[in-house]
Every structure is written in structure tokens, then in C-alpha cells.
Amino acid sequence: MRNGRSANQLKILAGWLLCMSCAHADPAARGEPAVAAHHAWAFKLTPSYYVTGGLADAIDLNLRGGRGAHALWLAHYRRAAEFEQTRIGYEYTVHLPIGQLIPSLQLASHGFAGGSLNAQIGDSVYALLGLGRTNLRDYYNLNFDPNDSIVVGLGTRLLPKSNVSLYTVRDNRLSTGQKVIHLVWRFAPDDHQRWTVDLSAKHGRPVADAEAVSGHALSLTYDYRQVFVRLARERRVNFSDADQTRVSIGLRF
């Protein structure tokens, strides 16, 4: 019954957000002056398909809307009859003289709640700091990093047309020793295209008293105007024994 209610809520909220997108579409896309564009809602719709060893294939549909400093998202994950979960979240970006601060909150069916606080300090060369916490209820982790964690890293925009960052996400609550190191390169050859490469390595235990596992992942994303496609392959996804392949195709509007 709870899953049925979640699906109905998803349909209602998705319809509301899609209506909002029509009412607040980017005026520049209709040939109107671009000066008003930053006051409009911008949306991103991302369907994803997950193939995981030992599990049924899964799908996820994520609709994210942003206006100025505000961002909202609504999503639903389903893995055959094994598990499904609806998520809704909010994020706010605070621009500061020395960088930006981003608090976020996410709620999900099965009683899950989580939040994070992330900071970027600096501009052409910057530091990354973050803290995440959840209520430890049932949740399929689509971030693929520890949720109850700290983030520490560095980044730079000094390379031509590039943004490069190196950061670590480390469990600091559940005594699992989970740690994921990311090296991310974003390259924009022109105003219409962008490549994103995310290479990561992990080590840690699924739970505190289990054997440690190690794995790595590679994600490649290509953006062209309003459309993007992402392909990822991960060993020992979410510190399990399974490997996973992910495919996403997205549309911005």
C-alpha cells in the first residue's frame, strides 16, 4: 500500500513540476531577451538504467528544477518487485565573498531523511569541504559514496576550458572505514559542449564487522546543448560484492 501511495504522489508532483516548467520556461529559448533568463525556472529530467550483478535491473527517474539559488528534485527508483523508493529534496546555494555554501535536505519513502552541508572556498583555486548525515533508515544510495561522511578536497579552474577537482568522501560515523577518492575533470571546448570524466577508487567495509572490499569506477558524461548522456561502470558498487553498469540520458528545459 505504501508503494502505491508513493507512486501516486510521484505522478501528482511530477505533473505539478512539469506544469511549472511550462509556466516558467526560459524566455531566451523563445527568442525573448536573455536578461530575464536567470529569473526563470530551469529543469533537468534524467532517466537512468542500472544493471547490477545478482540483482534485477533497475530504473530511476529524476526531475530537478532550479531557480536562482533554489533547487528542488523529485525522483523514483524501482528495482522490479524487490525495492522501490520515492525521493524529494531541496538545496539552497549561498554565495559568499570567498566562495559558496550549499545546505540540502532529502526525504524518501521507507522513512528516510538525510541532509548535507557543502562548501567551496576560493575561485580559480578552491577547497572543498562537506558533511553529510542521515537517520540510517532504508535507502538505496544513488550517490554511491558514504552518506554519513565528511568531504575534503581541492580543485582548480586554471587549466584552459577545464575544471579539475580531487576529493575524498570518508565515513565518519558508522566505523566502516569506507573511503572513496574522486578525480573529476570537466572540459568545455565551446559554449555548447562539455565532457565530464569521474574516476574513483574505494576501500572499506559494508558494515563495521565485515571484511573490507576495494573497487573502482569510471563515469563519462557528454553534454550537447540541452541533452546529455552518461555511462558509468563501477566495481563493488556501494561496497557490496556486486558490479554495476549505469546508463543515463537527460534533457534540460
What residues fall within each predicted segment?
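Feature captures outer-membrane beta-barrel proteins of Gram-negative bacteria and organelles
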Residues: 59-68, 84-98, 103-105, 113-129, ...
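Eukaryote-skewed repeat-based solenoidal scaffolds used as protein-protein interaction platforms
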Residues: 134-141, 146-161
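Transmembrane beta-strand segments that form the barrel wall of outer-membrane beta-barrel proteins
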Residues: 41-51, 69-80, 88-90, 98-109, ...
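Cleavable N-terminal export/targeting peptides
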Residues: 1-40, 240, 252-253
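An anionic, turn-rich surface loop/hairpin at beta-sheet edges
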Residues: 198-203, 207-219
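Outer-membrane beta-barrel initiation region
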Residues: 26-87, 249
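Long terminal segments
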Residues: 31-46, 145, 166, 176, ...
